[in-house]
C-alpha cells in the first residue's frame, strides 16, 4: 500500500529539477556565448554557428568563408538561419523555465508547472532540431572525433533537457491543500 510521499522528498525532487534547469542554462551559455557557438575549434578547422573556417592548403592558413562561398560549399543561408534560430531560441526558452517552476512550487499551481514543462519541451525540440539541421549541413567537414567543448556542452544540455522532461512527467507537481500558501514556500 503506497501512502503519500513525505514533504521533504517532494522538496528534494523539486530542488533536483531546479538544479538540472540551472545546469542546462549554464551549459547552453557556455556553448553558445562563451564558445561563440563553435562546435569544432581546432588549429586547422573552426566550424560553428557564426564561424566557418577551413584549412587552406595553398596558403597554409585557416580561411574563413562568408555566405556566397558557403552556399557554393553546400551550406544554405536559410538552413543556417533556421539552425541558429533553433539553438539560440532554445536558450531563450530555457531561461524562461525557472520562474514558472518556482511559482508552481510556491503556489501549488499546476498550470504554471505545465507552462514550465512546455517551455522545456519546446526548448528540447528546438535544440535538437537546430543542432541536427546544422550538423546535416557541415557533416562532411565535422567527424565524430572532432567535436569541441561547445558541441559536447550542447549535447549534454540536450540529454539533460530530455532527463528533465522525464523527471517532470514522472514526478508531477502535487497540490497540497492542507497548508497555507506562505508555508509552502
From Swiss-Prot:
GO CC terms, sorted: membrane
Topology, Extracellular side: 33-77, 136-150
Glycosylation sites: 38
Topology of the protein relative to the lipid bilayer: Multi-pass membrane protein
Pfam families: TM140
Coiled coil: none
Tissue expression summary: Expression significantly higher in gliomas than in normal brain tissues.
Compartment(s) of residence: Membrane
UniProt key word Transmembrane helix: yes
Keywords: Glycoprotein, Membrane, Transmembrane, Transmembrane helix
Residue ranges that the UniProt entry lists as topological domain Cytoplasmic: 1-11, 99-114, 172-185
Chain segments annotated as transmembrane: 12-32, 78-98, 115-135, 151-171
Protein name per Swiss-Prot or TrEMBL: Transmembrane protein 140
